[in-house]
């Protein structure tokens, strides 16, 4: 089965030439790394940065912030498999849904789903349903793929997982399953937590609320992040994916490094109602 892009032409350019230019614009932007990535031919023997938080809005808004995560990912070469955890914005499908086989198509080509890792995760966690419906119109995973294709071509596979039930218990179960796969060493696996931060408040208020969440991320405190989201009304859409990578980072002794925090107002100039964006790497 081939998953057809749902947001090409809206969240990012539908033309492949213009899309590559848009991705390069993201890397070179003042809010981005200000440099194009260069992927090494020979990977280091041990990957340091295995987990990332990356935003998922339209590239014209969040592309420069997202580019920071991808720049650091590029430094250690192409992984075998990228597990992409995203929130469910559509309400379709199961509580935790995986697209377990086939290919995902973007203007830059097709990328294969790692069916082996997908089925292993389903068995290990016992909370993931094989369910394509949740993915049909969901953008949180789709918008990550062109960045990955720009860096690595077709030399990687993906495991797309959409999370509707974003609770600490679900994050713990997902993290435990992913941890077993990563620590087995059978494949070089990277995990992306796709999330924006606070939504649709003035710039200063969004920065204030985002910082509450960022404080918990820097402490690797997934329950603290959940508490802040619930009690302080921080409207981060993908806190479930973030909680999962916080647990993984702690289990594998990785430290959080905030790469860039900004809002849509920083790129659009309109700071009256913005969305917060964050890139974080978890490494040695």
Swiss-Prot record:
Q: Which CDD domains match?
A: MEMO_like (cd07361)
Under InterPro entries, the record lists: MEMO1_fam
Report the family membership: Belongs to the MEMO1 family.
What is the name listed in the Swiss-Prot or TrEMBL entry for this protein? MEMO1 family protein Saci_0089
């Amino acid at each position: 089965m081939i998953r057809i892009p749902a947001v090409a032409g809206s969240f990012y350019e539908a033309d492949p030439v213009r899309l590559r230019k848009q991705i390069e614009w993201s890397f070179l932007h003042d809010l981005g790394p200000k440099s194009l990535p260069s992927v090494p031919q020979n990977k280091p023997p041990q990957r340091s940065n295995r987990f990332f938080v990356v935003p998922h809005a339209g590239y014209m808004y969040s592309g420069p912030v997202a580019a920071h995560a991808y720049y650091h990912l590029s430094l250690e070469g192409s992984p075998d498999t990228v597990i992409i955890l995203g929130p469910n914005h559509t309400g379709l499908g199961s509580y935790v849904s995986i697209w377990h086989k086939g290919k995902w198509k973007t203007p830059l080509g097709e990328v294969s789903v790692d069916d082996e890792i997908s089925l292993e995760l389903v068995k290990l966690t016992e909370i993931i349903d094989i369910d394509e419906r949740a993915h049909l119109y969901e953008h949180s995973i789709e918008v990550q793929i062109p960045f990955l294709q720009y860096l690595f071509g077709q030399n990687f596979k993906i495991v797309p997982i959409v999370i509707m039930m974003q609770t600490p218990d679900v994050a713990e179960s997902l993290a435990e399953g992913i941890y077993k796969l990563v620590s087995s060493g059978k494949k070089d696996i990277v995990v992306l937590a796709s999330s924006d931060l606070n939504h649709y408040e003035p710039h200063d208020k969004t920065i204030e609320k985002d910082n509450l969440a960022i404080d918990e991320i820097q402490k690797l405190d997934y329950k603290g992040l959940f508490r802040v989201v619930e009690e302080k009304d921080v409207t981060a859409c993908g806190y479930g994916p973030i909680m999962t990578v916080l647990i993984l980072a702690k289990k594998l002794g990785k430290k959080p490094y905030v790469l860039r925090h900004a809002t849509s107002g920083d790129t659009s100039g309109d700071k009256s109602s913005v969305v917060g964006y964050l890139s974080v790497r978890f490494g040695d």
